[in-house]
């Protein structure tokens, strides 16, 4: 895995693209496992944080400034865009994606292959694209 590389932060200049400074760090708390081929970008102006007792499967990408809570389980090929925040006890199935600057609450379950494009409150189970309440998703996709 790669931990602490520069995040993907650019803005256009007249003649080229300017890299936005990435001066934060990565903080990995106790009893956390990170799978093979995963990347965790350091923060831009704040830090990227992985909470304690969190398990990250293989090939996960965590962008700059992401904050993952405690006791989370995240399956392979999940991607987090910059500055997203996950609460505690979040479970995410494989190949799900979380757009940037979102807040995922505590005790949330996100089904595999889901695309999260808006905030998710505490104690929700979602899946699909766009991610929606699992009961609605199953009713609409029988």
Which residues make up each language-model segment?
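Structural signal for interior beta-strand "rungs" in well-ordered beta-sheet cores
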Residues: 1-133
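Long, leucine- and charge-enriched amphipathic alpha-helices
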Residues: 138-142
């Amino acid at each position: 895995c790669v931990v602490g590389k520069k995040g993907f932060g650019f803005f256009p200049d007249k003649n080229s693209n300017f890299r936005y400074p990435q001066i934060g760090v990565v903080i990995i708390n106790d009893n956390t496992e990170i799978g093979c081929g995963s990347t965790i970008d350091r923060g831009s102006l704040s830090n990227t944080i992985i909470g304690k007792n969190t398990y990250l499967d293989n090939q996960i990408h965590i962008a700059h400034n992401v904050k993952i809570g405690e006791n989370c389980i995240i399956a392979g090929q999940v991607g987090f865009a910059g500055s997203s925040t996950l609460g505690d006890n979040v479970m995410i199935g494989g190949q799900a994606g979380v757009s940037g600057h979102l807040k995922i609450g505590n005790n949330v379950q996100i089904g595999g292959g889901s695309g999260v494009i808006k905030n998710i409150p505490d104690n929700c189970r979602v899946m699909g694209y766009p991610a929606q309440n699992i009961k609605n998703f199953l009713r609409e996709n029988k």
